[in-house]
Amino acid sequence: MTKTYHIAVLPGDGIGPEVMAQASKVLDAVRQRFGLKISTSVYDVGGAAIDRHGSPLPAATVAGCEQADAILFGSVGGPKWEHLPPAEQPERGALLPLRKHFKLFSNLRPARLYQGLEDFCPLRSDIAARGFDILCVRELTGGIYFGQPKGREGQGMHERAFDTEVYHRFEIERIARIAFESARKRRSKVTSIDKANVLQSSILWREVVNGIAADYPDVALSHMYIDNATMQLIKDPSQFDVLLCSNLFGDILSDECAMITGSMGMLPSASLNEQGFGLYEPAGGSAPDIAGKNIANPIAQILSLILLLRFSLGKDDAADAIERAINQALEQGYRTADLAGDGHAIGTHEMGDIIAKFVVEGV
C-alpha cells in the first residue's frame, strides 16, 4: 500500500503566500506524475497569525505541525509588527520556537550557481564560469550562541562581556553524519571547517569528525580553518561540495555562499531533527516591499519543496523531476525580475506554471 504523507504548510507574511502558491502547484504536478499520496494543511504563522489570533505561533499551528511529516514554511515578518516587543515579533516568536520545539539541530543551505546566471555572480567572470554547487551543513543548537556562561559584568573600564563556545561529542557526531550522508548523495566530498590551531572546541570537533569519517570510506574528508575557508570561497568555490560547520562558522559561511550565487530568490534551506523531521524554507526574507506585485522569484520556495521531498519523505525521483524542470525553465530563458536584468521578466505565477508544466511533461 502506498504511504500517505502529510505536509504542514505555513505561508506566513509578505511574499510568503505568493511563492507558497507556486510550490503548491509544483507539488500538485509531482502528485500527478508520480502518483504520490501527499496531503497538505495550511496554518497561520508570523504576522498573519498575530493579526488573526494574537500570537505569531498559535497552538493550533504547532499541533498541526506535530501531526505532519514535515513543515513547508514561507517567510515571516515586516514593518507592520516591528513595534512589538522582540519576543513577540514574527521572526523570534514563530521561527525560533518551532526550531526549539521540534529539536531541529541541523541546517542545510544549498548554494548553486545555475547555468545562464553567471552574470549575476559577483565573482570574477572566469571564476563564475566554472560554476559551483555547495551544500553548507551547519550545526544549529550548540556552540557559542548557546554556551554558558554568557553575560556582562563590572563597570567602567573593568566592564566585560563574555560568551562560551561549548560542543559535546554527541552534537558533533550527529551533525557530521548529516554531512557525510549528504555527501554520499552528491559528489562524495566533505570539507570540515574549524579553528583547531586555536580553539579547544575545534580540536574536539576535528577529532570527532575524523572518527566519523572512518564509517564513510567512500567520502573524501578534508579540514580547513575558517579564515582560509572564507577566502577560498571567493577564490574558487567550485572546489567545495559539502561544508561541515559549527553554529558560528556555518552562520558566516552560509551567508557568504548565498551572496556569491547572485540572488536570494534561488536559495532554499532545511532544518532537521534526529528523526528526519524538517522545516523547509527559503533563505530570503518576506520582502514586504514587493508582496502582492507578482514579481517575487518563487524558485527558492520550490527548491525548499525539493529538499523536503529528499530529506523528510525520501522521494528522490520526484525531487529530481522538479530540479530538471527548474533547470529547463532557466535554460529556456524564463526569468523573474530579479534575474531578468534588461531582458523580459515573467511573473511569480507564470514561473510557477512553467515549472509545474515541465514536471508533468517529464523534461
UniProtKB/Swiss-Prot annotation:
Positions that bind substrate: R99, R109, R138, D227
Protein name: 3-isopropylmalate dehydrogenase
Summary of the function given for this chain in its UniProt record: Catalyzes the oxidation of 3-carboxy-2-hydroxy-4-methylpentanoate (3-isopropylmalate) to 3-carboxy-4-methyl-2-oxopentanoate. The product decarboxylates to 4-methyl-2 oxopentanoate.
GO biological process, one term: L-leucine biosynthetic process
Main location: cytoplasm
Residues annotated for Mg(2+) binding in this entry: D227, D251, D255
Cofactor binding remark: Binds 1 Mg(2+) or Mn(2+) ion per subunit.
Family the entry assigns: Belongs to the isocitrate and isopropylmalate dehydrogenases family. LeuB type 1 subfamily.
Reaction(s) the record says it catalyses: (2R,3S)-3-isopropylmalate + NAD(+) = 4-methyl-2-oxopentanoate + CO2 + NADH
Biological source species: Yersinia pseudotuberculosis serotype I (strain IP32953)
Chain sites annotated for binding NAD(+): 78-91, 285-297
